[in-house]
Design a protein with these regions (language model features):
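Extracytoplasmic/periplasmic solute-binding protein
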Residues: 151-155, 160, 181-231, 273
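A structural signal for short loop-to-beta-strand junctions that line the ligand-binding cleft
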Residues: 101, 108-109, 133-167, 193-197, ...
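Extracytoplasmic "Venus flytrap"/periplasmic binding protein-like
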Residues: 75-138, 151, 166-175, 274-275, ...
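Glycine-centered hinge/linker elements that transmit conformational signals in sensory
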Residues: 227-258
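Conserved N-terminal structural module of periplasmic/extracytoplasmic solute-binding proteins
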Residues: 9, 24-118, 304, 325, ...
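Hinge/lid segment of periplasmic solute-binding proteins
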Residues: 114-161, 172, 179-182, 189-190, ...
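C-terminal capping/gating helix-and-loop segments adjacent to ligand/active sites or protein-protein/ligand interfaces
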Residues: 145, 349-356, 371-429
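Extracytoplasmic/periplasmic substrate-recognition and gating elements
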Residues: 57, 74, 79, 288-350
Length: 430
C-alpha cells in the first residue's frame, strides 16, 4: 500500500504548547433519526442537489455527545435564528450509513469522518473549508486536507496509553518493559489484574500495537518495508518488548477475550485492576462509579518510550453537494462553534473535548484529558499510525483474529508476532 500523498490527517510531534479526540465512543449508526425521533432517511433531499433546505442537518459518529449536541442545536437557533437538526445514531455502522445518504443525494449538511482512508473515499463530497475564520489558530497538522484543500476541522485531540491508579502503583513501577511485566506478575500474586485489555478489536490489539510502529524513525517507510517483506516485526526490538507484555498478560491474568470494555473500565474504577490500556475517552464511564483515587496516563514503556499516542479521532466536514446557501449555513455553524463563547463552552465543558484552537481554554478537564493536554504541551506524544499507514480494515479483519488465536490457544509469542506481520502483508495486497 503506497501512502496517499493527497490526504493529510497527521498529528505530528510539532504540536505546540497552545494545542491541547470516542476512539473511542465513536460508534457508528445504522439508523438515522431527527431530534424528534422520526426517520430522516430521504427527508433531506431538498438540501442536496442544489436546493436550499434553510436549515442545518448534522450527522456524526460520537454517540457520547449526541444529547449535548441536541442542546447545542437549541441554543444555536436561539442565537442565530437558524434551525439545526441532529440526526441520531445507533448501532455500529455510521460510515456505511453516511455513504448511503451521500450517494442517494440525501446527505447531511455537516458530518464527521475519522481517518485519512474515509477522507480519500469521500473526497468528492467534501467542501473546501479554507475560508473558515479560525483555521489560522489550529495547528496545520491537525487539519484534514485533500488535493491541497482544507476539508476537515478537528473536533478534538485524544490520547491513549497506560491508564493507571496512582493509589495502587507509581509511574516508576511501569516505566520500563521489565518493570511493567513485573508489576503485572505482582498484581496477579495479590489477586488483582495488573494491565487490563478487553475483547473489542481496537482495545485488544489495535491501539496497543500502534506504539511499536509509531516509535520507528520513519513509521511510513517502516510500514512499507514490512509490506515489501524487507522487515519482519518479529525481529524488531519494539515489537519483541510488546510481545513480553502480551505474554505476561496471557500467563497471569483472566483471558481478555472474556472481558468487555465496560467490565474492564469498571474493574479499574473499583480498584480490581491497576491499569488498563485505554484513552482519555474512558473517563466518562467512571461517572457511574464512586471513584475516589487519582489516575493518570503513562506511556507504554517499550524500548524506553516516554510518550503517549495522540491523534485526531474525528473531523467536521461540510457536504459540497448541498446548495450554496446550505453550504454557507454549514460553514457559519462551524465558525460559530469554534469562535463564539457558547460554542467554546460546548466544546470544552459540555462535550468534554480537549481544545484544538489556540487561545481556547478548558477549565474543567477530567484527569485523563488533562494528562493528554499536558503531554501535548510538553511534546511527549507519538502519532496514530493506524489512521495513516495501516491498510484499511486490518484491525477488525485480521489483527483481532491473530490476537484471539493467541489468547485462546498455545500459540507462542514469536508465532503471534509473525502472524501479525503476515496479516499486514496480506491486507496490503488485497
Amino acid at each position: 500500500m503506497k501512502k496517499r500523498k493527497i490526504v493529510s490527517l497527521v498529528l505530528a510531534t510539532v504540536l505546540g504548547a497552545s494545542m491541547v479526540l470516542g476512539g473511542c465512543g465513536s460508534n457508528g449508526g445504522s439508523d438515522a433519526t431527527n431530534t424528534e425521533g422520526t426517520n430522516t432517511e430521504g427527508t433531506n433531499t431538498e438540501g442536496a442537489s442544489g436546493k436550499s433546505s434553510g436549515k442545518i442537518t448534522i450527522f456524526q459518529q460520537k454517540t457520547e455527545i449526541y444529547d449535548q449536541l441536541k442542546e447545542l442545536a437549541v441554543d444555536y437557533e436561539k442565537e442565530t435564528g437558524v434551525e439545526v437538526e441532529v440526526w441520531q445514531i445507533s448501532g455500529d455502522d455510521y460510515y456505511q450509513n453516511l455513504k448511503t445518504y451521500m450517494s442517494s443525494e440525501s446527505g447531511p449538511t455537516v458530518f464527521s469522518l475519522s481517518s485519512s482512508t474515509e477522507i480519500a473515499e469521500m473526497s468528492a463530497y467534501l467542501e473546501d473549508l479554507s475560508d473558515l475564520s479560525f483555521l489560522d489558530k489550529i495547528n496545520d497538522d491537525l487539519i484534514a486536507k485533500s488535493d491541497d484543500k482544507t476539508v476537515g476541522v478537528p473536533m478534538t485531540a485524544e490520547g491513549f496509553g497506560l491508564v493507571y491508579n496512582k493509589n495502587l502503583i507509581s509511574e516508576d513501577q511501569i516505566n520500563t518493559t521489565d518493570a511493567l511485566v513485573q508489576t503485572i506478575k505482582d498484581a496477579a500474586a495479590d489477586g488483582e489484574t495488573g494491565l487490563g485489555l478487553s475483547q473489542e478489536a481496537f482495545f485488544l490489539i489495535g491501539q496497543i500495537l500502534n506504539t511499536p510502529f509509531a516509535l520507528q524513525d520513519d513509521p511510513a517507510q517502516f510500514c512499507q518495508d514490512v509490506y515489501d517483506g524487507k522487515v519482519n516485526i518479529a525481529d524488531v526490538e519494539e515489537f519483541q518488548e510488546l510481545g513480553k507484555i502480551f505474554e505476561a498478560i496471557k500467563e497471569n491474568q483472566k483471558n481478555p477475550l472474556e472481558v468487555s470494555y465496560d467490565d474492564n473500565c469498571g474493574d479499574f474504577a473499583t480498584g480490581k485492576t491497576e491499569m488498563i490500556h485505554q484513552g482519555n475517552w474512558c473517563y466518562s464511564l467512571f461517572s457511574s462509579y464512586d471513584v475516589d483515587f487519582d489516575m493518570g496516563i503513562a506511556p507504554l514503556p517499550i524500548a524506553g518510550n516516554k510518550s503517549i499516542a495522540v491523534g485526531v479521532p474525528s473531523v467536521w466536514c461540510v457536504n459540497t453537494d448541498a446548495s450554496d446557501s446550505d453550504k454557507q449555513l454549514g460553514k457559519d455553524f462551524l465558525n460559530w462553534l469554534y469562535t463564539s463563547e457558547t460554542g467554546a463552552d460546548y466544546l470544552t465543558n459540555k462535550f468534554g473535548f480537549i481544545p484544538v484552537v489556540d487561545g481556547m481554554e478548558a477549565d474543567n478537564l477530567d484527569p485523563l484529558s488533562q494528562a493528554v493536554s499536558d503531554a501535548i504541551a510538553e511534546g511527549n506524544i507519538i502519532p496514530w499510525t493506524f489512521n495513516e499507514e495501516w491498510p484499511a480494515g486490518i484491525i477488525t479483519t485480521y489483527l483481532v483474529q491473530n490476537a484471539e488465536e493467541y489468547f485462546s490457544s498455545d500459540m507462542t509469542t514469536d508465532e503471534f508476532l509473525k502472524a501479525l506481520n503476515d496479516s499486514f502483508v496480506t491486507a496490503v495486497n488485497e
